Amino acid sequence: MDVWESQHFSALLYLLQCIESNPSNPNVSSRLLIQCLESYSKDFLKFLALDPANANSRKKLESGEVELGGVINKVNEQFIQLSLTLSTQLNLDEIQCASLLQRGIEASQNLDRTPVQAALYFFFLAREQLLECLESLTRVVGLKDLESDISTALKSYLQSLCENGNNLVKTCIDTIPILDNKVSEILKSEAGGQILGVSEVVDFQEFIRLSHEAHVAELETISVILYQLAKVDLFQNSHFESLLVMLRKYDSPNKNAVLILPTLYAFIDKVLEVEYLPDQKVQLRSNSVEILQKIHQAIIQSPSQDWRSSQFKNILGIWWVTRLNATCKQIEKVPSFIDYETTIKNAANEIIQNGVFSDMITLLVYPFRQSETEGMEWAFAFKSRSRITVNWSLIRPFIASIIFSELRSFAQAFVSYMPDILKTLRLLEEDRYLTNTTYPTSIPGEQIEEYFPFEEFYYLLSSIYTYNVSWISDFWDDIESDMYGFLTWSMGSQIPGIITAFTLLLASLCKNTTSASKIYELFSEPIPEVGHLESLMITSPSWSYIFNVFRYYISHLKPVQTVVTSSGLARVHTDPSEIDTDSALILQAYILLFSSVVRQDAQIASTFCENQDLNPIATLFELLECRLPDSVRICIVRALESLAHLSTGSFNNALWTALDNWFVSSVLFDVDGGLAPMSIPAISKRSLTKPVTSCGPLLNNIRRLTVNLEMKISFVNLLTSLTRNKSELNVNLTFPENLGASYRTPGVQPYVDYVVETFVASSTQWRLMRDVGSIRLQYACLQYMLAVLDGLNIDLLLYSRILSSKVRDNLQNNNLHVYLTRHPAISLLEALYTESVYSGLFDLVEYGFDQLEDVSVPKTIVITVSASLCILRNVLSLQRVLFKNVVPYIAELGISKYILDLTISRRAYKEVFMTRISSIVHLALLVGSRHKCFLRSAIEILSYLVDAEGFMNKRNPDENKLLCSIIRTANESKRIIFGFIRTFESQFLTLLSTNDESSLILKLLLNNLKQSGGVYSLALLILGFDISSTNVITLRDQPGYVGSRVSLMNSLLDFIEGRTIVNGIWETPVIMVQALEIVAFLCSCPLTSEVTLSVIRARPGLLVKMVDGEPILTQQVIQNLGGFSSEEVSMVSRCIRSRTQIMNMLATEIHYAASVGQNKYLNEYVASLIRTNEKTHSTELSQKESGFKILEFMDILRIDPQSITFELPNIPGFNLNMFITRFDRGHSDFQFDTERVLKIYRLFFEAEMTSLGGSAEEKYSWLEQQNSKLKELAQRLNTFNAHVVLLQDIHGCLTAWARLTGLLVDDCNEVISDVHFDDFIWEVLRLVLPGVTVHNLGTQGTVSVTSSVIETILPHALRRIGALKPEELGKSTYFMEGIHDVIVGLLKGIQCQQSDESIRENLYGSLLSILTVFQKHTSANGGDKVDPVFKDAFQKLITPNLLTSQFFDVLTKDALYTNGSCWELSVIILNFLHHVSPDISTHLYKYYLRRNFVSSFIDAFSRAFSELLSSNKDVLEVLSGLEAGQCLLITFAQNKLTVHSVLTFDYIKLMVQMLLQLCKQGGIQYLKPPVQRLMIQLLQIFILVLMRVTLKEISNKDKLLLQSIFLLSRKLQDSVQTGADQALSPEMNTVKKYVETISRLLDLYRD
């Protein structure tokens, strides 16, 4: 394969990934692995070296004939020039450039790049994949538990690559300066704005970006490869020397120097590695003293002037002497050149005094750990000796983990093997401190910086352990380790700097509950109480000691002291002293340690607060009043925030009360304690919901406290922790209901106002200055807003209406009104509507997308933008619930309207959003961002914006069109589309593995398609349809649109096509179902159908592959379905749903292909569904298993709905009926929101527990029992929901199958042979008929579908009758038996008690098809002559024995009491049955007499007649029903037993009125033929009336009726006379004969 192919290295990468995922049993043979590796040896040995441009290759290229892919090709001048451009750009052989350009041309459209840009992409991609393979290879060979054969094979192969002459290590080392120079040249070229020798056809910015990122990544990967080669002992001394020479040439700071340091460390470890001999002696493994001496001289004894950076010399030197000393202490025979004092100790001391620990922090820690990130709390006390600032682009996390792992190894070795040096360092620092204290040498006005290596070592340890929390756990788990011993040894120091550094180390080691418990226990030993600070210095620290220190400083630094006098408490103003720097650092360290411990464990925090001797809350607030540096005061506020971090209930309320009281009563605001009053910032009048003065002095005092930026951030974080609801139930306010009631309106409104005004001010500053500080403050404010919005339990409002007072009784003080009026979310929502606030939110959303995508963007900006998106999403979500489920029921809920006034008086936030066009564009861009934190919020906001139902309970499709127009017309529209494509393609592999997680993008698109009805919508634009506002689609082939291979639509099809590779894929992920639903919807939508189907057809056999790949449910699965878990049932549902979508797509395509006559595709589809090319069918009805694929899809008919739960889960103590809104006759499309149900029951149980008697243990035991019941309830509800979905999916699948079957029968019969067609029809009937015969309530939906299928296909099954001759009828016994079985099944289905009207309507239609067909063929050519053979056969099919009384009961009830088609068909069938045979007719008349049916039918039919006449409806609307009824009445009237029941005076009146009405419409010849036929039927009845009833009887009964009869006669005669001179239709001839007969009868009666 060509090296420029994107899949060139894929096979090797796959093998290596398989081995790495399971190294002990990789299921990969070593032989196969070596064969694969050997095929890449040439690439590895060549490494990144390129054949340079040369004259011979240039001459061949310019000749116009070039060998590409083993074939000689003629190339044009443009191709030659582009190849030369690449050659100049990359300094690459011209022929190779031609091959590379060919690959670029092939992929340029898919990549949406020019051919040269695409070629550059493949060039750098090949290099990246080569290095990735080598990195994986060297990493795998170093795995500890690697299978032995694989390990041996890999080591042998790598050894061959590293041999002399083919030295991979040397090649890597030599490549580093080459790449370094290239990076420098690229940066210079970018600064200069031009590239020497590059043709203008190459996009300058594209090349700069691609080449710079590629070369930087290559440097990092090579450093990893070298490190891993050194770890597996494939590094030689010469390689070490080469790297050492390279290191000497680097300045500080230099990224490459930092990258190669781990390799040098790894080599030193291998050189100094020891081995244990059988006699228990230990010796050097390499056993080469000369090498050790040479390394020592090169690192330690080399002159400083040989190093451009002494810092790197010291960093490498301290590592060398530490490891060398460790080795010397383990081996028995120490090398002769080593003298501990001179070689190790003195060298180490010199390096340490030169500041190596500080340099390690500056050069190896700071580049990977920003000061504002968590884990850098110790940085405030660290003084770096170097003024170097490191500003690198982000480095791979794996490299950072390598560096910190090596640093940790160094620190552990230094503590274990250099304890004497540590003791010396400590003693020197103590001596220096005592000397400086006794004899200060500083000159007034001059500050001399002093550095203490022992303290710097503590800070180095802090920086190392905070990198990886698991290392902290390892530290505390091993109390026998040297590191733990070093920690306990350090506790006894009395030097301020050491105390500070040691305390900060402890704070850094406190990152989880276990470490917090360990530190708490370590400091919990009792200590005698002392009175002054000097006495405190003689003891080891404890919590009592620390709080005594706090109280000591309170007594000396608080400006106003509270004293006890004879008249009570009084305040005494004092002159507070100043705190020195060392004391301030100690105080800050102690506060930080306390903060770290209480933050990790709520129980420890509670224990602290319950200790009246310590009283931390009051102590911290008193400390806050002292005259302290700002950094200490900020640390105090952070300590309060740590106390609030996990606080709940009364503890949280106590913190709120203390804070509120402190702001009102604190001496800080009575006496100027260093805080000047802060002026109110200039804020828009609409930025706050209330005037500033309305908040009283409390808000002013908050402003005075938070003058400093860091103080503002810390205070807002404190408010966030106090406000955040930590309870799972989230049903009560997180502050006391009466907070501040004695001096203001109770609640936390001043704090909300402060956060809002702070957010507005910081937003303005960010907009103007773009400083990081303001963005950090914005982030803190946004976190507070999120905590407030999340804390509003909207479920209380929802369930309050459903469950009435039961919810309200469980609220704090049983008052929902108080909960709503005091909850800060309501006032915050109102504030969010002010222009200055939502402008700040939108400004964050509109932050430059390119800046966000830059790898150097600060993380703070990213998380702040993400937080703003979360708030916008939460507001839209909250409003949706309020508008839809709360506002309409405010009166019912008992909520005052003014509480939720904002939801009524203000427009929806959705409308606010729609006015920010640029925000919507940026929001859509964020979907495609590399920062995954934006995706969910951005997608959900777009979902709310396109949702037309959730806001104000009204649909407004224009908003969906507006949103689509905004994005479609934006300059970034194409970029947005590509962003959606990239995000989907980067996610789908992950979603495939999760199986039950949906794609947010596909969910948005699917919902939008359904809501918009497939017309002009955002979903169509994103999928790649170029649609105009007039709903016209243009098929474009540009990338991004469906006409190109680069579009989201084609990505979906690629994704779906991948599923067809393996047959019988059981685990159908949700994302696959979503993709199929979208494509199926596009196929069925009239606007997109043609384009979508053409795209599918462009993929040969895709639909056929999808059909073939669909799995079939096994009998075992069907039998066990009732016992499946909810996850297993969902898996079956997804499988069935995917099948449904495939059948829907296929049905749409078949219908389209049949309509345009594309028989080629029809043949393919028919062959896949009916398998005409795989099975030889006989002409007889086979009893074997069906060979039709489409019938295999009906495996779902074997599922018994009774095995799936229809009833509600019944668990004692749970009344689930109150959560139901729709639940009808056991069939349910209602699903439970399991999470909400569990929440409300937890609320009930906790409230009930508080009222229980007994001990705390008994209450807890009772609650545990209830929780176990809740778990069972959750499982039952989830299973119930899964069953509901499964039944819906089964019904959907049946409907799709019925449609597809109908299309095959109706549209494809011409492309199916008669044999196959007949066999298919009867196979379908045999499959579905048994289910129709006997069904129950649970199978009604299934039978409704299958009975419609029978009605559709039965006429086709009967078509052979027309081809049979009478003499052939007796020989086709199998055919007649089949029809007989169908009739029996239909009759039984009609009689079934659980059949509804729709089912019976289908069955009547099927039965009528049979009756109609046989009626046609029992009359020869439509005449009166009856074929006795056919009639005899027909009478044998339907005998009186089949027509039971139960069947007649159902049939006559439908004829009497139903409407529409069911009534019409039942009447027609009754009429037909009278003509089947005299026996059946006699049987029917006897039944009529027993049930008095005829009179009842006449009454029902007369009522229908009367309604028609009174409503003035058009006769044509009900014509078919009238005809059916009239035919049956004619039949009744022709029988002497029922004629008198038919010819009632009421019916005669209605009949005469109808005839008069028809005569009024003009001449009879102008009536439409169907109406003429109805008139014929009426005239037949009229003649029977005149023949059976005398005019005298009519006159005696109703003289008006008699007059109407004579009037009707004249009208009829006039109508007939009017058209006498015209050619008459058969209907008119019949009417004319009947009119003449009527005239003669009337004349006869007159005579």
UniProtKB/Swiss-Prot annotation:
<keyword id="KW-0963">Cytoplasm</keyword>
<comment type="function">
    <text>Functions as a component of the nuclear pore complex (NPC). NPC components, collectively referred to as nucleoporins (NUPs), can play the role of both NPC structural components and of docking or interaction partners for transiently associated nuclear transport factors. Active directional transport is assured by both, a Phe-Gly (FG) repeat affinity gradient for these transport factors across the NPC and a transport cofactor concentration gradient across the nuclear envelope.</text>
</comment>
<dbReference type="GO" id="GO:0017056">
    <property type="term" value="F:structural constituent of nuclear pore"/>
</dbReference>
<dbReference type="InterPro" id="IPR021827">
    <property type="entry name" value="Nup186/Nup192/Nup205"/>
</dbReference>
<dbReference type="GO" id="GO:0005634">
    <property type="term" value="C:nucleus"/>
</dbReference>
<dbReference type="GO" id="GO:0006913">
    <property type="term" value="P:nucleocytoplasmic transport"/>
</dbReference>
<keyword id="KW-0539">Nucleus</keyword>
<keyword id="KW-0813">Transport</keyword>
<dbReference type="GO" id="GO:0034399">
    <property type="term" value="C:nuclear periphery"/>
</dbReference>
<dbReference type="GO" id="GO:0005643">
    <property type="term" value="C:nuclear pore"/>
</dbReference>
<comment type="similarity">
    <text>Belongs to the NUP186/NUP192/NUP205 family.</text>
</comment>
<dbReference type="GO" id="GO:0006999">
    <property type="term" value="P:nuclear pore organization"/>
</dbReference>
<protein>
    <recommendedName>
        <fullName>Nucleoporin nup186</fullName>
    </recommendedName>
</protein>
<dbReference type="GO" id="GO:0005829">
    <property type="term" value="C:cytosol"/>
</dbReference>
<dbReference type="GO" id="GO:0044611">
    <property type="term" value="C:nuclear pore inner ring"/>
</dbReference>
<dbReference type="GO" id="GO:0005635">
    <property type="term" value="C:nuclear envelope"/>
</dbReference>
<dbReference type="Pfam" id="PF11894">
    <property type="entry name" value="Nup192"/>
</dbReference>
